[in-house]
């Protein structure tokens, strides 16, 4: 992992944000992080017992990103998730009962048990789900952003992708198009340092 130092401006802004949020909001955010961690550990246990169909990409250790990102958005904004997205779904307001039902292949799940761990979409809550193709959600975010712009609504699309997806050409093409068209898209690269199994220093120079 590369060592780096935060600029004085970033440190100053960090302290400002902490002050703005206040102790009650910070406690609420911490509680949410604990809930996500507990949920993920339970999901991992069920997966190891063979109760979950399909594969599972956990987000243990990435809870703060999920909670922080969701608190930066507002009701009515859109979410496009990625492979390790359980925490983002929960932070966006998804029901843990319906999420777990989805993992277990039950009809009461968000996608009637057919989407499994990764494809949880809660369209009523503007959570548009994840894509089976690495970085597949990033170009879709351009379409969502264009829709927002054409409808002239005060919304934003948050699209999340990992460091592994950052190697995909579609990510850079999509960012360029969103920039040219001035679209309301927020790109969040959730860098866990290893993607699936490739250390970041070997994937990027």
Describe these PLM feature segments.
Residues 15, 28, 158-160, 194-196:
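A short, structure-level motif marking secondary-structure boundaries and short turns
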Residues 181-201:
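A short, conserved beta-to-alpha structural element at the edge of catalytic cores
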Residues 39, 47, 83-86, 161, ...:
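Aromatic side chains
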Residues 1-84:
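N-terminal amphipathic, basic-rich helices that act as targeting or association modules
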